[in-house]
């Protein structure tokens, strides 16, 4: 997934990508954002929390007039980090959700909708997501009630859907219950259609 939208997509659009391979250094990161005129910054919650710990004073040494969008992925983004971005960078940080199996982002806080800090966001156009529960017989059914915890599921058939696991057909079959792909992630969906990560249904990361 990171290869798809982190490397291939920028190349197809003629976009310059900047990757800093050195150890974490808050001052250097901010300098790169400012001097290289970064417009879209994609990072991880752990990195954001490290910047928060380094203090806002370092960030305010520079200006970021070209920066227009900041996104985070890899683990749940705490609400405080979203508001830190707004206060220090002048932009909220957008969280999203995907898996290697999905081949791309499925759920996101996009610029078109209000951000709910702490949420993964809403399904992207063309993606149908729901919360499912298993009954005593193991039958999987979607849950209509808001804020009910269950397993996050996607309706099968999106363009980048996985086609199998190498040498493990049984595992692939177990990922599906009828028309639904079972992600293994526990989540809830609120009344506005935003999804909130709860945890893993298994021990796979």
Language model features with spans:
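Short glycine/acidic-rich beta->alpha loop that forms part of the nucleotide-sugar donor binding site
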Residues: 3, 25-26
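Alpha-helix N-cap/helix-start capping motif
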Residues: 23, 45-46, 75, 79, ...
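Gly/Ser/Thr-rich phosphate-binding loop
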Residues: 12-15, 30, 35-43, 52-116, ...
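A structural signal for the hydrophobic beta-strands that form the central parallel beta-sheet
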Residues: 19, 43, 72, 182-183, ...
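Conserved ATP-binding/catalytic segment of the ANL
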Residues: 144-147, 153-205
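Adenylate-forming AMP-binding core of the ANL superfamily, especially NRPS adenylation
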Residues: 76, 115-167
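Short, solvent-exposed loop/turn segments at the edges of secondary structure
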Residues: 5, 10-12, 65, 124-126, ...
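Conserved AMP-binding loop of ANL adenylate-forming enzymes
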Residues: 1-20, 43
């Amino acid at each position: 997934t990171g290869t798809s939208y982190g490397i291939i997509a920028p190349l197809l659009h003629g976009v310059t990508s900047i990757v800093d391979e050195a150890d974490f250094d808050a001052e250097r990161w901010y300098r790169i954002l400012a001097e290289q005129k970064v417009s879209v910054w994609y990072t991880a919650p752990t990195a954001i929390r490290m910047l928060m710990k380094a203090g806002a004073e370092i960030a305010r040494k520079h200006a970021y007039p070209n920066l227009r969008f900041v996104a985070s992925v890899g683990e749940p983004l705490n609400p405080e980090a979203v508001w830190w971005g707004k206060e220090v960078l002048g932009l909220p940080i957008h969280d999203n959700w995907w898996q290697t199996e999905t081949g791309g982002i499925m759920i996101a806080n996009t610029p078109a909708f209000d951000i709910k800090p702490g949420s993964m966001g809403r399904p992207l156009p063309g993606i149908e997501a729901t919360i499912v529960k298993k009954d005593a017989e193991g039958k999987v059914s979607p849950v209509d009630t808001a804020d009910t915890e269950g397993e996050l599921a996607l309706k099968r058939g999106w363009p980048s859907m996985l086609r199998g696991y190498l040498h493990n057909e049984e595992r692939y079959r177990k990922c599906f219950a009828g028309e639904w792909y079972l992600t293994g992630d526990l989540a809830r969906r609120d009344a506005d259609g935003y999804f909130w990560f709860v945890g893993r249904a298994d021990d796979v990361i």
